[in-house]
């Protein structure tokens, strides 16, 4: 299935806590706490968010998401991409100066996060000054709601700030689309096949703003869904549940 209204989903993993004996269908308190910490993202000791939170979506049960955040080690040895690729990236590319001997368990978000400030200008794409770009420019931004590396909430907050800073008319130049279930760029239990190139071409050359983009996917044969410009989401109207024509984009 799909979680279209992802911001309306307030799932609490605490509901999975074992009532008594640990079984394969419940989680211990320590596991629930770890899951909450993972989805909340890194924070300082006083609770200030550094990045995140991540949203709960259907794709988190897939191999892509698990491979990034949890891994598949049966011995306790770290083998997730966060613990391997992520550690190398942080140690050599993000920190100033580089720290090849970095122990991630000793990383202090109160003390050490500031060590990334020099590279942030090259890696952070969070500018909201887009009024000059909006003068005849067009941009489509899209993100999978099960993206194992990018937090959708951070992207939606950026877009909200873009609208606040530049005014509602900026939506005539920049639109954001979220794809339920899609992992990083593609994959996942999603309708992850769509043509953004045609959408941006039609917008630039013919003045046709992308009010909805039709998507399909190998994970759901015979199913199509509309991708809606944020903050709108696809809502069922009537008719065939497998057809995009049965859905409207609304808040």
Which role fits each region the language model picked out?
Residues 1-251:
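C-terminal His-loop and adjacent cap/lid subdomain of alpha/beta-hydrolase
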């Amino acid at each position: 299935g799909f979680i279209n209204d992802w911001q309306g989903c307030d799932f609490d993993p605490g509901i999975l806590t074992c009532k008594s004996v640990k079984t394969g269908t419940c989680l211990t308190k320590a596991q629930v706490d770890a899951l909450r910490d993972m989805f909340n993202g890194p924070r300082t000791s006083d609770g200030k968010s550094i990045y995140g939170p991540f949203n709960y979506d259907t794709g988190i049960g897939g191999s892509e998401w698990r491979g990034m955040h949890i891994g598949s080690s049966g011995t306790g040895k770290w083998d997730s991409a966060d613990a391997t690729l992520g550690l190398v990236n942080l140690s050599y590319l993000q920190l100033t100066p580089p720290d090849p001997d970095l122990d991630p368990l000793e990383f202090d978000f109160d003390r050490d996060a500031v060590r990334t400030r020099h590279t942030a200008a090259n890696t952070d794409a969070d500018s909201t000054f887009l009024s000059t770009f909006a003068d005849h420019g067009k941009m489509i931004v899209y993100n999978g709601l099960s993206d194992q590396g990018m937090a959708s909430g951070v992207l939606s907050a950026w877009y909200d700030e873009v609208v606040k800073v530049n005014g509602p008319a900026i939506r005539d130049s920049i639109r954001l689309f979220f794809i339920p279930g899609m992992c990083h760029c593609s994959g996942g239990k999603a309708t992850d096949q769509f043509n953004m190139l045609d959408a941006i071409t039609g917008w630039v050359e013919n003045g046709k703003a992308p009010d909805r983009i039709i998507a399909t996917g190998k994970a759901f044969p015979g199913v199509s869904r509309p991708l809606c410009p944020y903050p709108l989401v696809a809502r069922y109207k009537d008719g065939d549940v497998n057809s995009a024509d049965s859905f409207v984009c609304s808040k």
